[in-house]
């Protein structure tokens, strides 16, 4: 509602907890993995996605209908949370939701890079951040990566993307651009937070998110064997790595895995690290970090039940629900078995 005035966490948390009760659980996911796209859409119509399915049903069908409905519902849910919020609580939530601006920027860049149709790019956009419809439209109309950078010149992504663009032109790979977007988002997210205990705990959660992003980037670089300076992709704000330690560890996969296993995240990520060693599965590791963040958010929401943390915990859980449903729909479209699809889901 407004960043001015006093916060109202009691009211917002109560509304969010009511919404959380309608999220899909294990039983719903198991049912969905055994349905086709049309059945999934009908199932969604009988749940919290009914408004979106009905509104979009005459325009889209199959997996496209599911994806458009998911993204519209997600944006609507988060707009509601902002409408309920006031004061510093509004500011913290709005700042976190700008992650979807970062998502949209990277989605457009990837789409332009692969010469995807505008409609193919648009279906993956989530309009839950700060960017208005006009900027989203300008991004979708950009016909080159340089044009995308130009659209963003007056945002926090402008200067970092312009600097990274030179390296992109030299290498032809998107990693410098994508990491420039992530660094800009997280550095802004972690700046100027409050000093009360709940906010300090929230800051610890954000630092864990940065740690997991740095760990995934380091593992990706270590596995690639590419001659890339890992320090160039370091995101400030976490506690697990320094720029120097990330650069050193990313050159040796075994040392990096051991370092993460011996860290404060070892218990949560241990099984995924073993799978990474045995099956070379980075996806399993990334799923494990997602699950660990969900669990961490839930834990903080219990410790500080009247603060921003239960709200952020719900945002993560809702985002994960959307990703799970999307994975099921796309898996069905690709002809994957129920077991193969279930391996792609993050369920806590």
From Swiss-Prot:
One of its GO terms (cellular component) is plasma membrane. InterPro entries: ATPase_csu/dsu_sf (IPR036079), ATPase_V0-cplx_csu (IPR014272), ATPase_V0-cplx_csu/dsu (IPR002843), V-ATPase_V0D/AC39_subunit (IPR050873), V-type_ATPase_csu/dsu (IPR035067), V-type_ATPase_csu/dsu_dom_3 (IPR044911). The keyword Cell cycle does not apply. GO terms for molecular function: ATP binding; proton-transporting ATP synthase activity, rotational mechanism; proton-transporting ATPase activity, rotational mechanism. Has multiple subunits with at least A(3), B(3), C, D, E, F, H, I and proteolipid K(x). Gene3D superfamilies: ATP synthase (C/AC39) subunit, domain 3, V-type ATP synthase subunit C domain. PANTHER family: V-TYPE ATP SYNTHASE SUBUNIT C. It holds the Pfam family vATP-synt_AC39. This is A-type ATP synthase subunit C. GO terms for biological process: proton motive force-driven plasma membrane ATP synthesis. It is found in: Cell membrane. Keywords: ATP synthesis, Cell membrane, Hydrogen ion transport, Ion transport, Membrane, Transport. The keyword Flavoprotein does not apply. Component of the A-type ATP synthase that produces ATP from ADP in the presence of a proton gradient across the membrane. It is a peripheral membrane protein. Disulfide bonds: none annotated. Belongs to the V-ATPase V0D/AC39 subunit family. Its main location: membrane. It comes from the Archaea. Signal peptide: none annotated. NCBIfam families: AhaC, PRK01198.1-1.
């Amino acid at each position: 509602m407004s960043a001015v005035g006093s916060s109202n966490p009691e009211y917002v948390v109560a509304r969010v907890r009511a919404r959380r009760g309608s999220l899909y659980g294990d039983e719903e996911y198991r049912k969905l993995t055994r349905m086709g796209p049309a059945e999934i859409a009908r199932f969604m119509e009988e749940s919290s996605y009914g408004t979106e399915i009905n509104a979009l049903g005459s325009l889209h069908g199959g997996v496209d209908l599911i994806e458009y409905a998911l993204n519209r519902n997600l944006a609507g849910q988060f707009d509601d949370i902002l409408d309920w919020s006031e004061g510093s609580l509004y500011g913290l939530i709005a700042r976190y939701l700008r992650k979807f601006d970062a998502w949209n920027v990277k989605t457009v860049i990837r789409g332009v890079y692969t010469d995807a149709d505008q409609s193919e790019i648009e279906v993956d956009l989530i309009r839950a951040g700060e960017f208005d419809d006009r900027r989203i439209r300008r991004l979708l109309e950009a016909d080159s990566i340089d044009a995308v950078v130009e659209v963003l010149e007056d945002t926090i992504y402008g200067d970092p993307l312009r600097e990274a663009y030179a390296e992109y032109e030299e290498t032809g790979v998107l990693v410098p651009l994508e990491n420039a977007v992530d660094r800009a988002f997280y550095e802004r997210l972690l700046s100027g937070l409050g000093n009360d205990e709940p906010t300090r705990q929230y800051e610890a959660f954000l630092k864990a998110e940065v740690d997991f992003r740095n760990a995934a980037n380091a593992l990706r670089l270590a596995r690639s064997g590419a001659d890339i300076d890992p320090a160039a992709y370091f995101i400030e704000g976490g506690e697990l790595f320094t720029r120097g330690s990330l650069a050193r560890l990313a050159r040796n996969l075994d040392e990096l895995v051991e370092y993460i296993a011996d860290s404060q995240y070892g218990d949560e990520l241990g099984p995924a690290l073993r799978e990474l060693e045995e099956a070379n599965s980075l996806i399993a590791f990334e799923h494990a970090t997602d699950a660990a963040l969900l669990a961490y958010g839930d834990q903080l929401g219990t410790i500080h039940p009247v603060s921003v943390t239960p709200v952020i915990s719900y945002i993560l859980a809702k985002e994960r629900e959307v990703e799970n449903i999307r994975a099921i729909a796309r898996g069905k479209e690709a002809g994957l078995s129920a077991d193969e699809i279930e391996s792609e889901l993050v369920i806590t």
